[in-house]
């Protein structure tokens, strides 16, 4: 069976040499040390990883007809990804993200402009419905429009497909959407936003996981930056 991702944007990464918090003050300018551009996004990165690990991956996204959309296509070609479920917007640009990386603290800040991938339509979802039904996993994230996420998740749940949600970039989601998800993968900030529990210890992570379980999530994975990863499968 297939694994399916809904994804895409292009990432611009700027390393800074700022030694204190990477958060910039109003009007502040800092000197960067390196800049690079490449295809990325939560779904794209996860899909490529699964593909390289031998998975049968179907990528679904919407691109603009622009130079950045071409970057995404070339990146897919470079790793041999299938392009059967790509859609195009004639009037909205390809999604992008600007990532500021503090090279000393190994922390980053990200501004996401979803662009075309936030315009997936009912017609687009109808075109991939059979592919979702025949998948083993559906991997979603919050860069695409939430109505597309919810419709895709309903199709998956109805057909016994396990749904994994990467909760970035954070936006509020309904308890109905969370109910029945196989796995959620927030970071500490997103976990707090979604549960009201500040994840500053393993005990607090237990508390956040308990809230997710009450909402019907089966498994919880919280990324903790330099401290590693918290995993709890008690809801399964």
Residue ranges: model-predicted function:
Residues 1-62, 67-78:
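Glycine-rich phosphate/adenosyl-contacting loop at the front of the ribokinase-like
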Residues 48, 96-100, 109, 228-232:
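Short beta-strand scaffold segments in enzyme catalytic cores
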Residues 61, 140-142, 166:
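Glycine- and other small-residue-rich loops at beta-strand/loop junctions that grip anionic moieties
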Residues 75-91:
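A glycine-rich helix N-cap at a beta->alpha junction
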Residues 80, 118-123, 163-169:
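Short gly/ser/thr-rich secondary-structure transition/capping motifs
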Residues 84, 88-89, 99-137:
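Conserved phosphate-binding/catalytic loop of the ribokinase/pfkB sugar-kinase fold
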Residues 150-235:
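Conserved phosphate/ATP/ADP-binding segment of small-molecule kinases
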């Amino acid at each position: 069976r297939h694994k399916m991702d809904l994804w895409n944007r292009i990432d611009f990464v700027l390393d800074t040499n700022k030694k204190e918090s990477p958060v910039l003050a109003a009007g502040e300018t800092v000197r960067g040390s390196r800049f690079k551009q490449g295809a990325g996004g939560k779904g794209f990165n996860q899909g490529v990883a699964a593909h390289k690990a031998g998975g049968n991956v179907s990528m679904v996204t919407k691109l603009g007809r622009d130079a950045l959309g071409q970057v995404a296509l070339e990146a897919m070609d470079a790793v041999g990804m299938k392009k059967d479920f790509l859609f195009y917007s004639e009037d909205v640009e390809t999604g992008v993200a600007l990532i500021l990386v503090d090279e000393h603290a190994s922390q980053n800040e990200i501004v996401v402009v979803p662009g075309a991938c936030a315009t997936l339509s009912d017609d687009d979802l109808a075109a991939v419905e059979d592919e979702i039904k025949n998948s083993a996993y559906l991997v979603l994230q919050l860069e695409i429009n939430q109505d597309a996420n919810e419709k895709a998740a309903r199709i998956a749940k109805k057909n016994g497909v396990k749904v994994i949600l990467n909760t970035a970039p954070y936006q509020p989601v309904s308890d109905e959407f969370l109910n029945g998800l196989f796995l959620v993968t927030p970071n500490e900030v997103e976990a707090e936003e979604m549960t009201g529990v500040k994840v500053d210890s393993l005990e607090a992570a237990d508390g956040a996981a308990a809230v997710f379980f009450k909402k019907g999530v089966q498994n919880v994975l919280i990324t903790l930056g330099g401290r590693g990863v918290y995993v709890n499968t008690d809801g399964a």
